[in-house]
Amino acid sequence: THPGVTVATLPLSDGGEGFGTCCVDACKGDILYTNAVDLYGNAIQAPLYTWGDTALIECAATCALQTKKDIMAASSYGVGMQLKNAIDLGFHHFIIGLGGSGMCDGGAGALAALGVAFYDRNGTAIPHPTGGDLQRIERLQIPSDFQHCVKCMHFTYACDVTNPYTGENGAAAVFGPQKGAT
C-alpha cells in the first residue's frame, strides 16, 4: 500500500477461457446454465453469460480443448445449441468468444444445431457435422425462416487473431495442430 496510489481494475480478455466471467463481472450480468454438448457430443450444462439483451457464449467453456484431441470428431454443435437456447430466451445480441476451442469445423456443427441441414454427395444427411465431415459436405439446406430469424440479431466474435479459416496462415493450418490435427 502506497499513500496517494489508486488501483483500478480493468477486465481484459482475448476471447478464450475466462472471457465470459470477465464480461459478466464488468457488465454486472448473470450466468445461466443451459443444456448443450461438448465438442464430442457429451451432454453438459454450459454457461450462458447474459446482461441486457446480450448473451455471451464462451467456446472455451462449451467446446474446450481437452486431453483427448480428435479434431476430425470434434464439432461446434454445442455452441449452436447455446445460441438456440439464447434465441429462445429472447436475446438479440450475441458475443461468441472463439478462443480455447477444441474444434475446427468452420461452424458447421453450430449451424446444424440451428436447423441448417447438411448432406453428402449421395443425399445422405450429416446431422451433427464435425471437422472430419467437412470434406463430405456437398450441399446444405437453410430453413426458410432462418434468414428472417437472424436479420434482427447482431453477432460479435471475440478473438485475438485475424487468421482466415483456410490457407497457409489460416486457422485450420495454424491452430489445427493444437486441436489434434496432423
Label for each model-derived stretch:
Residues 74-84, 88-95, 102-154:
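Glycine/threonine-rich beta-strand-loop-alpha-helix active-site module
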Residues 2, 32-36, 80-82, 120-122, ...:
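Glycine-rich loops and low-complexity Gly/Arg-rich segments
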Residues 132-147, 158-180:
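A structural signal for small-residue-enriched, beta-sheet-centric alpha/beta enzyme cores
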